């Protein structure tokens, strides 16, 4: 996805191609997590990065995908936006209004948690399910009253002007993005997966050690203005990819339960069944 900084930089610098010259590396971009996990489930791709919600929907639908790692949370990189002159001043004011977001995305979770914090239910708003590009158009045209979205779309809207941040992810206790793979692939390629993820962490570190060069490269690759990329980097913490520990798994379980309670997923899921842990042997093979 456009927001996967480490992956985009790794691709731009051909880090995986250099690390694994005998392997054929293919890169595929998706507009959002749900579409990516569909491709992962049918074997079109081997590894993908997505927000916290798409894996829950995929698991509920029976996809045999596993969480192989997680990034730290980025609470400042995901927001609910309203027009600058909107009468909506608080999340509670969203009651009865149209809110655009990608169904089954991390922004879906941001919205649900923000509503709960404000004493509202999901049924108190008018959800409008749209892809980021379509949501942006609907928001700009005034066809929806608010837009829950992640970076870099958020930074692009912010710098274009005429918007106000109603709420970001601060104090909403979300996880960071996850990396997922099909279970059979993960079980057979553990060492390779670990090496790939380590490469992504190295690539992400370039946003700090080579900030200006990285901004220029990301702007060119993503087709976005450099100020948008700079804003996005300012919204995110250093991103080192780590295994999914018990605390993260428990937080993701809380999220899954929240979506089930709101009848947004058809059945309960057990996140612990989908956590993949590299073995010591696989670690030594690196």
Explain the meaning of each model-derived region:
Residues 1, 92-104, 201-205:
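Short loop->beta-strand "edge-of-pocket" segments that line small-molecule binding or catalytic clefts
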Residues 1-13:
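Extracytoplasmic "Venus flytrap"
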Residues 3, 31-33, 44-56, 61, ...:
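Beta->alpha turn/N-cap motifs
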Residues 9-10, 78-88, 176-191:
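A bilobed periplasmic-binding-protein/Venus flytrap-type ligand-binding module shared by bacterial periplasmic
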Residues 34-48, 60-62, 92-95, 117, ...:
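Short helices/loops that flank or line small-molecule/ion binding pockets
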Residues 53, 124-128, 132-220:
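Pocket-lining segment of extracytoplasmic ligand-binding domains
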Residues 187-266:
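Secondary-structure end/capping motifs
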Residues 257-286:
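Conserved C-terminal helix/tail region of periplasmic/extracytoplasmic solute-binding proteins
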